[in-house]
Regions:
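Bacterial signal peptide processing site
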Residues: 21-24
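Early exported N-terminus immediately downstream of N-terminal targeting peptides
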Residues: 63-101
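Bacterial N-terminal signal peptides that target proteins for export
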Residues: 1-9
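Post-signal peptide N-terminal segment of mature Sec-exported envelope proteins
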Residues: 29-55
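Surface-exposed, gly/pro-biased binding rims or lids
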Residues: 157-198
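Mid-length scaffold segments of soluble, non-membrane domains
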Residues: 104-162
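A mature extracytoplasmic/lumenal domain signature
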Residues: 88-92, 123-125, 131, 138-143, ...
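C-terminal motif of bacterial Sec signal peptides marking the signal peptidase cleavage site
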Residues: 16-19
Length: 216
């Protein structure tokens, strides 16, 4: 009887052991939905409530001249001070046409989205033979089919195009080109030129340049 009992106990133990080993380890999920056992998992941003500020659909961006100045400053100790900086938000087409779904010819445009687009000059520069003193300015435009009027305005720290035209500082007329490679997002960058740098403004298939000359 004792031998039979031992065999039964051994059989039950073996069954239990095999049952435990056959169970797959379940992934550990924390309260936030992140799989701790999967390093490639991520939390979908739209599922995370943000009590402080939501992510804007038109991201804010910054362009320097020299290009990538903050990186140069951190890697090259002898990097001189920047000449200028542009801060703007980048709207995108989302299946719409630039003209006339988003913009209208002859109507002012903030050259971005949300806060007014701002350009900062760290030293005096020249634009179309006009001296622009160092300082902060709002940058906006009035687009036409063949040319854009670019305006510098001193009414800084404002939203959208609530611009006080009495504070317009300078106006510049620059030609535009069409049928360029199409860009989904508004893009504004500085590009080196013979006498300084051009501010390139490009969106959809439209592109224009504002030539900026440096004063030695």
């Amino acid at each position: 009887m004792l031998t039979i009992a031992r065999r039964i106990l051994s059989f039950l133990f073996l069954i239990t052991l095999l049952s435990c080993n056959s169970k797959k380890e379940q992934p550990v999920i924390n309260d936030s939905g992140l799989n701790k056992n999967d390093p490639t998992s991520f939390i979908s941003p739209e599922n995370i409530p943000n009590p402080y500020a939501g992510v804007d659909i038109s991201p804010m961006d910054m362009s320097y001249y020299p290009v990538d100045y903050p990186i140069l400053k951190m890697t090259v100790s002898s990097t001189p001070s920047p000449v200028m900086r542009l801060i703007y938000s980048r709207p995108h087409l989302q299946g719409r046409t630039l003209f006339l779904d988003l913009l209208k010819y002859g109507q002012p445009w903030r050259l971005g989205a949300n806060e007014a687009t701002e350009i900062d000059f760290y030293s005096d520069v020249t634009i179309q033979e006009k001296i622009i003193p160092a300082g902060r300015y709002i940058l906006y435009c009035i687009p036409q089919e063949k040319k854009w009027d670019i305006i510098l305005n001193t009414n800084i720290d404002t939203w959208g195009l609530k611009t006080d035209s009495t504070k317009d500082f300078q106006h510049f007329s620059i030609p535009v080109s069409h049928n360029n490679p199409k860009l989904e997002y508004l893009t504004m960058v500085f590009e080196k030129s013979k006498k300084g740098a051009d501010l390139i403004i490009a969106w959809s298939d439209v592109m224009t340049r504002l030539p900026i000359e440096f004063i030695p």
